[in-house]
A protein has these predicted regions:
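Glycine-rich phosphate/pyrophosphate-handling loop used in enzymes and phosphotransfer proteins
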Residues: 1-199, 203-236
Length: 236
């Protein structure tokens, strides 16, 4: 009865689809999934025919990030951008399930049974404005798919920052400095364990760098990151 009243529809364009949380063929084809070869740190596609072993992109080679490995599922453009903006600002929590499955597929080679999954935290003021932390939703789903631990309170954002949308890479790094800290009450959970930090979008990497540097205080075995979408470098 409910199925006839509310048939499944595409998450992006509302066209009829076969199952819940799905995309129609045109929208699916417009999602820019990232495939290998890609940067070992930030997941940016690398334009190279033959690469041997993990390789950084030019930006990560010149300025290595504060983590050891990273994966990204999508490029932040076309339908992927619309989907993420709907999740972030449009209360479209129904989009998290498929998005997390794509992220899990991209980062599952980084996961081990003892990996601790956490998410980039929101400052409480921004949390009140958005009502939820989209990175935390993704982290919960990824940890559930992998059947590993999720630590929602591992990191905390103790200083609000000005919006980063129009800031340069240098401005982003300056604004994010000392904004994220390891929660002392949860630090022991991180000791000698691999940690995976989840975020929805990576542009310059300043936010994830701040989160990774905060994790260092807990002496983890390894720090990795997983990003739902990577901003193309000509967009910042």
């Amino acid at each position: 009865m409910l199925r006839s009243l509310y048939p499944p529809c595409c998450l992006l364009c509302a066209a009829p689809v076969d199952r819940d949380f799905g995309l129609c063929p045109p929208c699916w084809r417009d999602i820019p999934f990232i495939s290998q070869p890609a940067c070992m740190f930030c997941g940016m596609p690398i334009a190279a025919d033959k690469l041997e072993g993990p390789t950084p992109c030019d930006s990560c080679f010149r300025a290595p990030p504060a983590w050891e490995a990273g994966r990204a599922a999508l490029l932040y453009q076309r339908s992927a951008k619309g989907l993420i903006l709907a999740m972030k600002h449009g209360d479209r929590t129904d989009c998290f399930k498929p998005a997390a499955s794509w992220l899990f597929a991209a980062c599952q080679d980084l996961l081990t049974p003892d990996t601790i999954v956490t998410a980039v935290p929101l400052h409480w003021r921004r949390y009140l404005n958005r009502k939820y932390n989209q990175a935390a939703f993704l982290g919960q789903h990824v940890a559930r798919l992998a059947n590993i631990s999720y630590e929602p309170f591992l990191l905390k954002c103790h200083r609000a920052t000005a919006p980063l949308d129009t800031a340069s890479s240098a401005e982003r790094r300056a604004r994010m400095q000392n904004t994220i800290a390891l929660n002392p009450a949860r630090a022991q959970a991180l000791y000698n364990k691999p940690v995976l930090i989840i975020d929805d979008v990576m542009t310059s990497g300043a936010t994830l760098n701040a989160a990774a540097q905060a994790c260092r205080a807990g002496q983890p075995q390894k720090i990795s990151v997983a990003i739902l979408a990577r901003t193309p470098k000509n967009d910042y």
